[in-house]
């Protein structure tokens, strides 16, 4: 819920808030669930299938190993662009395979958030090498 509220607030600083909010929300969700809470893709698939996803998220949030981790967010605006940087305290991941919709995951019950953010919300997504920090950039259109 905190992530959704912050996403809605930050989206207002982008030229198309309705598009930006989707990407910001998805990137926040990934930072918390897959980054700080260290829930891998396959486990999330199984937890959703057996209807225990929310229970596992709550359990990990209460676990000091994961629950004390934070997501850091910064916003930067220049004459050329607007950018949001999201950093989590997780181990990182191999982000490249998620930048575009993979037909092999098309029927999965999750796993399209990064591709949606990349295609709909930002002109560019840049991850650090480790995969625990992403910057979403929207370039200003010249009139």
Regions found by a protein language model. Name each.
Residues 25, 76, 139:
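Short loop/turn motifs enriched for small/polar and acidic residues
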Residues 1, 81-85, 91-94, 98, ...:
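Flexible, glycine-/charge-rich segments associated with ATP-binding catalytic modules
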Residues 18, 22, 107-115:
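Short, conserved micro-motifs enriched in small and acidic residues
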């Amino acid at each position: 819920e905190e992530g959704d509220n912050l996403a809605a607030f930050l989206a207002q600083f982008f030229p198309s808030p309705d598009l930006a909010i989707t990407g910001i929300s998805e990137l926040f969700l990934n930072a918390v669930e897959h980054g700080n809470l260290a829930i891998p893709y396959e486990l999330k698939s199984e937890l959703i299938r057996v209807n225990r996803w929310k229970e596992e998220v709550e359990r990990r949030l209460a676990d000091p190993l994961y629950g004390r981790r934070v997501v850091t967010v910064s916003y930067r605006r220049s004459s050329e662009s607007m950018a949001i940087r999201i950093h989590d305290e997780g181990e990182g991941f191999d982000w490249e395979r998620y930048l575009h919709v993979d037909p092999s995951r098309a029927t999965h019950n999750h796993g399209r958030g990064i591709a949606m953010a990349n295609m709909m919300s930002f002109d560019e997504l840049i991850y650090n090498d480790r995969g625990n920090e992403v910057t979403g950039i929207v370039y200003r259109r010249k009139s």
